[in-house]
Amino acid sequence: MGYCDGKWTPVIIMVMINSALGLANALVKKVLDGGVNHMVIATYRLAISTLFLAPIAFFWERKTRPTLTLNILVQLFFSALVGASLTQYFFLLGLSYTSATLACAFISMTPAITFVMALIFRVEKLNMKSKAGMGMVMGALICIGGALLLTMYKGVPLTKLRKLETHQLINNNHAMKPENWIIGCVLLFAGSSCFGSWMLIQAKVNEKYPCQYSSTVVLSFFGTIQCALLSLIKSRDITAWILTDKLDIVTIVYAGAVAQGICTVGTSWCIRKRGPIFTSIFTPVGLIFATLFDFLILHRQIFLGSVVGSGVVIFGLYIFLLGKVRLMKEECEKKLPCRFNEDDQEEDDDEQYKKGHLMVVPMTP
């Protein structure tokens, strides 16, 4: 009965979305290991996302789309610089040094990092004496502790490699070196920080331009241009832009159309139905599938440090989300002391969505 009335539909969709994102990270890692420039991947990925979402934005929001002024365009340009270009630059470069598992673990930290940055820049106020405030702070600190554990402790391998796979790793072993592993984790954390900063910037932009799909298309378009320029500044070798390997082409099309196109639409729908915290709960699914794909597709070893560190990050994420839920209930009870139920929360989420405060996350790393 629960499935028939549609209550399980958002759950199934979020599991599928995070599975798709985990697969995308594993495939992109394989392409990076093949020698493709990480900014070339970012450029093509954002370009495909732009082409995929443009028709959806045009038809879906044509009646509600406000005028796109020069001021909003400038804000979207800088939002794209932080949320698309710099985030993709750090994440993909960090991914080339580490693994898809670690990349997804750092992505899982984004809500906590965004919260910390909101406190630093005084965008959000918090009552440290309340249980909700203490829970959110504790969750954020645990996430950061998990990130440090991922960075500083690699641990022993939990899986064995066959002789052929060992030979392949010897030929491409830069990610196996401890110093490169640490550099990769630092880059992934920088990517998470850029992504968290973008959340705060885009929240302000959404107040003036609350059309999520149109905003995403403009962001992706600006991000495409910016990533292309960053790539050309780093290397002017035109041959780097010519992709001949079928796996490279399929991976980039999949990453753009599915991971940033379809997943954007699906996540947006789930936010409308169940709220942003509901969608955040499924982030660990991407981490689990990334680990499986890392092992099954890339044939990489799974290390103790990755498992323990990822577990700490996920534990911190759930502590943070529980604190956030409690805070939302406390705020609602202050306004309506005798009323708080799922219907009220869904109405509040829908109202916030219309105002642009609940946004889709188009720049998935």
From Swiss-Prot:
Membrane-topology annotation of the record: Multi-pass membrane protein
GO MF, one example: transmembrane transporter activity
Keywords linked to the UniProt accession: Membrane, Repeat, Transmembrane, Transmembrane helix
Stretches that traverse the bilayer: 8-28, 40-60, 72-92, 101-121, 132-152, 181-201, 213-233, 249-269, 277-297, 302-322
Compartmental location: Membrane
Matching SUPFAM superfamilies: Multidrug resistance efflux transporter EmrE
Signal peptide positions (record): none
GO cellular component: membrane
Residue intervals of the EamA domain: 25-144, 196-321
Assigned protein family: Belongs to the drug/metabolite transporter (DMT) superfamily. Plant drug/metabolite exporter (P-DME) (TC 2.A.7.4) family.
Official protein name in the record: WAT1-related protein At4g01440
Source organism per UniProt: Arabidopsis thaliana (Mouse-ear cress)
